[in-house]
Amino acid sequence: MFRLRPFHCLEPAELAAFELRIAAYYKSPPESYYFIANQAANQYTPEQQPFHCHLASQTFEGARVLELGCGTAHLCPYVEAHGGIYHGIDYSEALLEGNRRAFPRAVFWKMGSQPQETFDLVASLYTIEHVTDPPGYLQQLWDNCCPGGVIGVICPDFVDGDGIPRSIYYGTSPGRIRSKLASGRLWDAMLHLFELFFIAPRWKSHARSISPGTFWMNLHPSDLAGQEHEIDGDAVHFPRMTDIADWMKKRGAKILATSRTLQNIPPHVIKHNCYVLAKKPA
């Protein structure tokens, strides 16, 4: 079902109902969820994770670093290697308890239980594509950053980057055209082809042509429709680097670096990913 809408076009009741569905999904994610997410996280290298390396290098001795939506906290050892003090926030207490065992010097809080503090560096690594209120999430990053501090966001670029994310499914149900035809679901297969070859390219062209600040949303991710989990199969927000940078600039931030300004980024990284590093006014 290819139906993407700007965030500001969503009805509050519709968004609230969807938030309940996605929250239930994250309370009991597929067993493969964090395994897939962590496959490339064991060792940051400039060739594979140039944005992660650049973000980690912003840490200084004694810096207080917060990752909002920390997952398994694979940023933590790189922060600590630079002399920083890592703090992570997420929803799952079981996940956080595992993090505490893995990284005993770090501090972990369940979302909503953290004290009202600010941090020198606030990081978001592949989280904003999973949130139902992207502007609200950016505001959280902003509010947790101290005056003069730095905010770093790394995520896919589903608008200016290549391809369409896997959370999109075509037709009336997830699955391949071949299986739809084999099972006699002809209308599903026909709609699949129409959306794949006509609707999706037109959306991509339109989304790239408009001004920043749209925050495209997908309230029908394939993971919630029963498809076996793939990376970004649960993506509900389609990030765009210029959306994020524009949001920061409108609040007076200085953009220190982006995926477009850093030099020597490998093509296989830049074609799918983006990065914004912004300095909050002092």
Segments predicted by a language model, with ranges:
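A short glycine-rich, Lys/Arg-flanked "PGG" loop and its adjoining helix->strand segment in the class I
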Residues: 135-147
